[in-house]
A protein has these predicted regions:
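Acidic, Mg2+-coordinating phosphoryl-transfer loop and its flanking beta/alpha structural elements
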Residues: 126-159
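Short, aromatic/basic amphipathic alpha-helical patches
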Residues: 80-89, 117-118, 140-146
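Amphipathic coiled-coil/heptad-repeat helices and related helical stalk/stem segments
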Residues: 44, 111-114, 135
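Short loop-to-alpha-helix "cap/lid" segments that border enzyme active sites
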Residues: 106-121
Length: 159
């Protein structure tokens, strides 16, 4: 199995920053400059840590079993890696896949291309991928490919 984790809304709480990228006056530079402030979402990070412990003992794929697929821009790669390391979510070199700096397509389109590339590079079929995702459009896209999707409730949702 490959385990695919989204970051924002699954591992990192960024609701306090969303005003920067919603509406007409989107300020992605400001958003990306502040994502290091994100607080960890305990439930998502605990699931990741548990899978990480199992994956280390039973690693089946040469590039590792855990991938991070995010709509974040490559501009934020170092900040994202530091955040993942700080919160115990990865080792030194995470399998981190991000959108290119100038790519402004919707997240589900970006992630579709990324997941296709991961499948081609690893030879792992979509049916052997477990995805943790909070965005409904992205979750639907993953499901349409045949991935097993754990649709994470948005961090602001109430029970």
């Amino acid at each position: 199995m490959l385990y695919i984790f989204d970051i924002d809304g699954v591992l990192a709480g960024v609701t306090h920053l969303l005003y920067l990228i919603k509406g007409e006056n989107k300020d992605y530079d400001a958003y990306y400059s502040r994502i290091g402030e994100a607080l960890p979402i305990a439930q998502g990070c605990e699931v990741l840590r548990a899978i990480t412990m199992c994956a280390w003992t039973q690693q089946t794929y040469p590039h590792g079993d855990i991938y991070f697929v995010t709509g974040r821009s490559e501009l934020s790669r170092e900040t994202t890696i530091k955040w993942l390391q700080k919160h115990g979510a990865c080792g030194e070199r995470p399998n981190l896949h991000m959108r290119s700096n100038k790519d402004r397509r919707p997240a589900h389109e970006v992630k579709h291309d990324i997941i296709q590339r991961i499948s081609q590079e690893t030879g792992v079929p979509f049916s052997d991928m477990v995805v943790f995702e909070d965005d409904p459009q992205c979750a639907k896209m993953y499901e349409s490919l045949g991935c097993y999707v754990c649709h994470v409730r948005h961090e602001k949702a109430k029970s």
